[in-house]
Amino acid sequence: MSAIDTLPPLREVIASHQLSARKSLGQNFLLDLNLTAKIARQAGDLSECDVLEIGPGPGGLTRGLLAEGARRVLAIEKDARCLPALAEIAAAYSGRLEVINGDALEIDPLAHMTPPIRIAANLPYNVGTELLVRWLTPRDWPPFWQSLTLMFQREVAERIVAKPGSKAYGRLALLAQWRAEARIVMSLPPEAFTPPPKVSSAVVHLTALPEPRFPADAAILSRVVAAAFNQRRKMLRAALKGQAPDIEDRLLAAGIKPTERAEQVPLEAFCALARELAR
């Protein structure tokens, strides 16, 4: 009998520990272990990796990651109600699961992990985008992680893989595709979750590139892209006027028409503009 078979069904775990998903924490529990195993497999061979999981809840994906052979899992959970359920998993997989009760935005996972590291998570909806941007914009590259396998609302997932000219194209697409290969690998309907959210979800897999696609300073690129898309319907000469007094000249030097809008500009041109603004 494998370790996962010694654990009670997740619905029993939720009932015995009186767990209910809290909207304030962005929680939706995924209880189908066939689905959590499928998500874990999207992260690839984990046998020689430490895996970081954010917001494990009662531990559905945690079980999947361990059953699929993760060398070790570090799970960061803000909701103390979930800790007893996670402790049961830790007992079944002795030495392979460490649980930290805290806020993922405030904890340095590297103090608890050994490379190589991958990240796999059904991210809490209220912090998922902020965490992704952090993981994509460290000053030094390559990052501490090899790959990200992350569940988002379908709309957010589509923004990560969007192309220029589309309504979904924006800051997330540019930052993700600058430093990673990004693709949607799974879709999940609302009824897969407890409680069912109002929208569908999708799993995005991002693999870190050895080098960014085009040279640019991460902080400058992130700032410029944020400014451009905060006013995406404005011409860039207006949206970016706070970035430099001679912004029209900088745009032209980067090969961008000042009258273009952000959604029309490809990644390579934004990187060229970031380099111009760094001079």
Swiss-Prot record:
Sequence positions that bind S-adenosyl-L-methionine: N28, L30, G55, E77, D103, N122
Pfam families per UniProt: RrnaAD
Coiled-coil intervals: none
UniProt keyword list: Cytoplasm, Methyltransferase, RNA-binding, rRNA processing, S-adenosyl-L-methionine, Transferase
EC assignment: 2.1.1.182
SUPFAM superfamilies documented for this protein: S-adenosyl-L-methionine-dependent methyltransferases (SSF53335)
Cited function: Specifically dimethylates two adjacent adenosines (A1518 and A1519) in the loop of a conserved hairpin near the 3'-end of 16S rRNA in the 30S particle. May play a critical role in biogenesis of 30S subunits.
Protein name: Ribosomal RNA small subunit methyltransferase A
Gene: rsmA
